[in-house]
Amino acid sequence: MKLLSSWVVAALAAQAAGAAISHKLDGFTIREHADPAKRALLQKYVTWDEHSIFVNGERLMIFSGEVHPYRLPVASLYIDIFEKVKALGFNCVSFYVDWALLEGNPGHYSAEGIFDLQPFFDAAKEAGIYLLARPGPYINAEVSGGGFPGWLQRVDGILRTSDEAYLKATDNYASNIAATIAKAQITNGGPIILYQPENEYSGACCGYNGFPDGSYMQYIEDHARDAGIVVPFISNDAWAAGHNAPGTGAGAVDIYGHDSYPLGFDCANPSTWPSGNLPTYFHTSHEQQSPSTPYSLVEFQGGAFDPWGGVGFAKCAALLNHEFERVFYKNDFSFGVAFLNLYMIFGGTNWGNLGHPGGYTSYDYGSAISESRNITREKYSELKLLGNFAKVSPGYLVANPGDLSTSTYTNTADLTVTPLLGSNSSASSFFVIRHSDYSSQASVEYKLTVPTSAGNLTIPQLGGSLTLSGRDSKIHVTDYDVAGTNILYSTAEVFTWKKFNNEKVLVLYGGPGEHHEFAVSGASSSSVVEGSSSGISSKKVGKALVVAWDVSTARRIVQVGSLKVFLLDRNSAYNYWVPQVPTKGTAPGYSNQETTASSIIVKAGYLVRSAYLDGNDLHIQADFNATTPIEVVGAPSGAKNLVINGKKTQTKVDKNGIWSASVAYTAPKVQLPSLKSLKWKSVDTLPEAKNTYDDSAWTSADHAYTNNSAHSLQTPTSLFASDYGYHTGALLFRGHFTANGKEKTFFVQTKGGTAYGHSIWINETYVGSWAGTSINDNNNATYTLPTLQSGKNYVITVVIDNMGLDEDWTIGSEDMKNPRGIIQYSLSGQEASAISWKLTGNLGGENYRDTVRGPLNEGGLYAERQGFHQPQPPTQKWDSSSPFTGLTKPGIRFYSTSFDLDLPSGYDIPLYFNFGNSTSTPAAYRVQLYVNGYQYGKYVNNIGPQTSFPVPEGILNYHGTNWLALSLWAQEDNGAKLDSFELINTTPVLTSLGEVKSVNQPKYQARKGAY
């Protein structure tokens, strides 16, 4: 589209976004900005009314999942995630951008290599997935600093406010990232349809009285508009508070949205659903706060975070499981949600120190797609049922949500029904039923009374009862349109429907042991054309044919006129997929009326990625983890042959026109090295604890002040690491003094974030350690010193494990400025000023050396500063020793080895590095895992919980040499060693995924100035 001149753009962007005008499209009111020039500037591709968003003029339910590209730094794997999201029936992905990774050095923006967003955009477009861009500048996201680079600790102003110093600090990043996103907008042929400024701008504390500040939000929005952002702004209030909703003045967004995590994060008790946690007021609050925009849940719970010392993400997945999805997501549908984004759909990994101290390396999140990218959790399959239902139910978007009732629609107060009643545009109505006690595990029988075009009906009409099992919810439909055939009602849930040539197919499913009915208006008879007729009966009631059926594990197909109704149990429905078949080319395209209509129905196993027609050949791209029967329902009329993953497959066609075939799966032989048998070389990575060590090249901690406006000094000079440009990984401090012989004890308070630890030496004598806990982010300790000789020079060496910077979720808290380093200290018999300090972190600090792996990947250990964690380190003069032998005293040692892999091609083989502990009381030690130079694991043996570290192909070279390195930090008198350390695989998946390309893995080169 044609953009206006830059000065006009700037002028328009500075206007408040509160006012709106409307016009009519097919009977619906579409909201746009009041200023004609601004409307021209903004675009016509993405519009909205009170019911939904329109994309290219078509009403669209946006069903989305959260994916963070920076948590999967292998660009050729993006398509894998997008195709798995697409297969759910979803049409969108939301993504954050982590400022800390792109501007680690203030004023120097770098988004190249693994940080380049263009491959992410390209993969989304290839898969047919729209994007919501969420670049902050603040993102929270359980990343270090909430996405703020560490140097913001030195900004003299309150973060996330209109303080000039803070706003100026955001300018470079904000302009660059918005310009990048602008190029990928739908207006430029890209996938981005929405843009979120800021993140959860929802509350303040600690004496800050400037919230909410519309001028601050307006500044963030203007930056985006100035850089070319023209798609609508959407917000994500942390709760339904109405902040920055349209009409609120400066800083108002186009579409108001909010977040919700109703079941919380108590993964330790995955079967506990606390009373009162199911929201019931969202529709009411939406009508009060933003009635002119579609109801949007921009973050709704898709999993949970887990802290250090937690119970692990398997239990988070159990807490937020398939039952949670049925009850809570269908409850969201009862409010008429039109934009639903699940946080997370794929979590990924906090590699390279990018996480905050409240979490560990894994960011699996218990999400539908696991950290290792598998989709074996039942919640993925359950989500597929709902996603595909939404995709083929356009009437839902214009149905009117009503009030919940325990008496109007059922014959028992044990159940609650919320109606979404048909409108002038669509007669379809939807009735969301759940237990009144949403956590109930009881099975309740009921009858349903609902309004239909045939009058009020009490169902079942042919006898029997309906059943709602414990922790279940259903969406019953009435007057549901299937390509012109009116389904008067169905108590079984709709998975999908399609029209194929002159035939229509409707797929219904129910839970085990349930009884259901559906009725077809105008029909008079039915026949069972596949499967047993046992448990199926039909009768004409009024002007509709009613079919009653009992759920069975065996599929039945009932023919009613030109409609074939597939009757499935839920577990069987899990194996069905609905890939779009493009009319041109091989890419599925974005979801719209045309591409949805072109879809086929495929019964398969693990995953169906896509389908396309090439001449007479119907191609299906699919993944398999077992020998799998394949069925194709609705093969295109021109298709004669079935080609699966490039191989022509023998098929049979039954009397119902269903193609059947089989794909054989043979588990490949996967040969992995024994890590214990490898030749390991090692080097002391704490030479600082030797009397001969020279720290003259270190940074002098000589600031008699701090630039941290939120924390005052308690030491003669600042020992806050970020004051000197060190923000990530291990921090080392060396305090020099001349003894007077009176020194008996050393008191120190250190701060490194939750689960951190420290160790202290004086000269070469070990003084003690803080091994850390799962809840403490700082520690006060007094250590007894050996006898010191008067007049002799001594050095106190303090090593601190920086676990990341705190987030800044509440405005005014300034939590992100919580320092890392030494907060206070005292040496008995000496003034504090008698000690002169030096410090270091990663080599170069903000002028970080490894620009390929980014500003956070390496910390301040000697081996890291030298670059020994990279491939091909200079190990010729190192000791031959193994981490399985380890250290016999406190210290830190660095180990390196290499191994070759040549894994079977054509399989997606998840690999994990697993640590084991054979002692009942875990020893206190810490390990960093480096794979080809990338820090892909931070293991704290005495805190946990993570012991298994998945590393994706692309970081690991599946067909070549790999360099593996470990730092082993022993914090006990008897040292530490690894009891067990293995490389393992889980089930290989026969895959249609293309080649996975290894990321750039720069090898070791001697670093100028390294110390």
Swiss-Prot record:
GO terms for biological process: lactose catabolic process; polysaccharide catabolic process. Its main location: secreted. Cleaves beta-linked terminal galactosyl residues from gangliosides, glycoproteins, and glycosaminoglycans. Has high in vitro transglycosylation activity with p-nitrophenyl-beta-D-galactopyranoside, methyl-beta-D-galactopyranoside or lactose as a donor and galactose as an acceptor. InterPro entries: Betagal_dom2 (IPR018954), Betagal_dom2_sf (IPR037110), BetaGal_dom3 (IPR025972), BetaGal_dom3_sf (IPR036833), BetaGal_jelly_roll_dom (IPR025300), Galactose-bd-like_sf (IPR008979), Gly_Hdrlase_35_cat (IPR031330), Glyco_hydro_35_CS (IPR019801). Residues 1-19 form the signal peptide. The active site is at E200, E299. Gene3D superfamilies: Beta-galactosidase, domain 2, Beta-galactosidase, domain 3, Galactose-binding domain-like, Glycosidases. It comes from the Eukaryota. Monomer. Keywords: Carbohydrate metabolism, Disulfide bond, Glycoprotein, Glycosidase, Hydrolase, Polysaccharide degradation, Secreted, Signal. This is Beta-galactosidase A. Its EC number is 3.2.1.23. Glycans are attached at N374, N456, N625, N707, N763, N780, N917. GO terms for cellular component: extracellular region; extracellular space. Belongs to the glycosyl hydrolase 35 family. It catalyses: Hydrolysis of terminal non-reducing beta-D-galactose residues in beta-D-galactosides. Disulfide bonds join C205-C206, C267-C316. It is found in: Secreted. GO terms for molecular function: beta-galactosidase activity; galactose binding. Substrate binds at Y96, N140, A141, E142, N199, Y365. Pfam families: BetaGal_ABD2, BetaGal_dom2, BetaGal_dom3, Glyco_hydro_35. PANTHER family: BETA-GALACTOSIDASE RELATED.
